[in-house]
Amino acid sequence: DYKGKLLVINFWYINFGPCIAEMPYLNDLVNQYQNEDIHFLALSFDTITDIKSFLNKTEFKYEHGSISRSLMYDFTPVAPGHFIVDSDGIIRDIIVGAPRQTELIFDKLVDLIEKNKK
């Protein structure tokens, strides 16, 4: 239950290099905010079985869920996508696509999280 909490959502899928490339930086983000009331959710259109198999081999510290491809593309036409949802459930910021320098995603998300913390 994420009601009343800041939520960072990542839309991704297993077979897309830019999604995989940013995972170490997203893990760093989770580590940085581990003592704060901020939640991290990764949503993929891959099956639960495929996600679990992938996570057995690759560390990705977000909580995980599976959604339909059409629902994912209703939110973001390009992966990866990142949404910052405030404690009132309002989408406050969106990053669509991966930066050319993947490590920049960490700084961009930190800036948005800090801006939206209450």
What do these predicted ranges mean?
Residues 1-7, 33:
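A short beta-strand-turn-helix
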Residues 3, 11-28:
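Conserved redox-active cysteine motifs that mediate thiol-disulfide chemistry
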Residues 8-9, 40, 82:
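Hydrophobic beta-strand anchors of alpha/beta hydrolase catalytic cores
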Residues 13-17, 45-49, 91, 98-99:
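Solvent-exposed loop/turn segments at secondary-structure junctions
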Residues 20-59, 66-73:
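Structural microenvironment flanking redox-active thiols in thiol-disulfide oxidoreductases
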Residues 53-60, 66-112:
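Thiol/disulfide oxidoreductase modules built on the thioredoxin-like
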Residues 115-118:
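Non-globular targeting/processing and membrane-anchoring segments
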